Amino acid sequence: MSRVYNFSAGPAVLPESVLQEAAAEMMDYRGTGMSVMEMSHRSKAYQTIIDEAEADLRTLMGVPENYKVLFMQGGASQQFAAVPMNLMKNKVADYIITGQWAKKAWQEAQMYGQANAVASSADKTFSYIPDCSDLPISENADYVYICENNTIYGTKFKELPNTKGKDLVADVSSCFLSEPVDVTKYGMLYGGVQKNIGPAGVVIAVIREDLITEDVLPGTPTMLRYKTHADNGSMYNTPPAYGIYICGKVFKWLLNNGGLEEMKAYNEKKAAVLYDFLDASELFQGTVVKKDRSLMNVPFVTGNADLDAKFVKAATEAGIVNLKGHRSVGGMRASIYNAMPIEGVEKLVQFMEKFEKENR
């Protein structure tokens, strides 16, 4: 069977060359006589893998020396608790609610202190990013929290909020490495890798060193303390070894393809193909305010739930898969992450044109 065009929101498409490399090394990783899946995480061979992965990520993102890179487990959702446990010194934090994942993080933080919702776009089904230029930031807030790209609703912060001097914490799961980033604008950014970097099971955090302290909330488990992982080079316990290995290959793939500047240009080109069609279509409509559109996740609808279902079924039969929208919103969603080739987006648009002609 030939490979499909996979528009899944995550786990998601990976670069074919990375999959081919991993397949070639599956039985014997570089003369070790074993797979990385079988390798001791304490071996020299694996230490080289994780060291190279960190070095390449630092190069890609321009991570300053005073920031730590942590490879952890538990996915982004575990960080909803870990962030307040580690950073909520005054037991106050401000959250900007632009979708389900920011809302879940905010709700989790309420278990540990005063979590204030200082802005929200819930009034219009999270179809836009609120004005964050002059927010009522709490005087004693430990941090301001955002989900930078909203996977479900297809919105993206084009400008970071004015945090009035407070540290910014960002969940970047679905826009990780999609464009250049100024790490110094964040106290911490983190993301699950299963959308834009690798297989499920790894979460990467980039966090400024002064935020990594022993002074965490009482009862914070050892495994949720950032200092545990920082002091042990992400090797306190057995890490998600194979997942990190694949992430490392994706980092090299990005470097070999011009880095994040080139990736951003390619992503803009891909997204324009789909958004231009949606803007001209008489059947399909995008659901997001134009200025806030994500380059990674593109939700759209026909306005008829039965027709939406018919489209998703027909697309699947044509080898264009995982277009069904998130269960909480319905409709369709095309996730066009770094590894989605522009040919896949063009094939999707061609299919949408055909479907529109047949279903007017």
Regions found by a protein language model. Name each.
Residues 15, 193-275, 289, 358-360:
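Active-site C-terminal subdomain of aminotransferase-like
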Residues 2-4, 317, 330-360:
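PLP-dependent enzyme catalytic core of the Aspartate aminotransferase-like
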Residues 284-315:
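Conserved PLP-binding catalytic core of the aspartate aminotransferase-like
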Residues 10, 109, 120-176:
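Active-site phosphate-binding strand-loop segment of PLP-dependent enzymes
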Residues 33-79, 86, 100, 108:
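Conserved N-terminal alpha-helix of the aminotransferase class I/II PLP-enzyme fold
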Residues 77-144:
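PLP-dependent aminotransferase-like
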Residues 3-54:
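A glycine-/small-polar-enriched, mobile loop at the entrance of the PLP active site in fold-type I
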Residues 169, 183-194, 203:
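Conserved active-site segment immediately N-terminal to the catalytic lysine
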